[in-house]
Amino acid sequence: MRSGDLELYTMNIDGSDVKQLTSQLGYDGGAFFSPDGSKIVFRSSRPTTEAEIAEYKSFLAEGLVAPTNMELYIINADGTGLRQLTHLGKANWAPFFLPDGKKIIFSSNHAAPRGYQFNLYTINLDGTGLEQVTFDKTFDSFPMFSPDGKKISFSSNRNNGGTRSTNLFVADWVD
């Protein structure tokens, strides 16, 4: 928390040339670079009302965050061109670029009436073309691709015998 808030930074592997990329009040995290290294996708909760700001700062003072409402953002790797990708409400998180760098896959509970049902979705880099990928009644999240783009891995609470255990699933990816 160099700036007093949870921001995104880049730096060289030796710790030199630290650059702050984000500066708006709120929790910025879960960042991943695009395959070509030119863009970064991340999740963020951005408090706007006085009550939200007070709650955020109170939690932050205790080293905590309560990011129940998170949206996805994309920014150029040099810190320019910040754009909000999703406007879905609830929790949109665990973003990851598809291997071709043209879409983002992420987890969201925006369609869940009670909030605990998370599924995977894809979206274009301009925020259009939202498409649901998984249709589970529990929790699917943390999607990532194999280096060749032929497999997707993700965590899920499906097929766990009614426990809260989360397991890793690997599936063929068909675009």
Q: Where is each model-derived feature located?
A:
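A flexible loop/linker signature enriched in serine peptidases of the S9 family
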Residues: 1-7, 22-27, 43-71, 84-92, ...
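CBM-like carbohydrate-recognition segments
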Residues: 144-145, 152-155
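Residue-level detector of Asp-centered blade-edge/turn motifs that repeat once per structural unit
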Residues: 35-36, 99-100, 147-148
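Short loop/turn segments that connect beta-strands within beta-propeller blades
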Residues: 12-16, 76-80, 124-128, 173-175
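Right-handed parallel beta-helix
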Residues: 17, 38-39
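Active/binding-pocket-proximal capping segment
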Residues: 89-91, 100, 104, 125
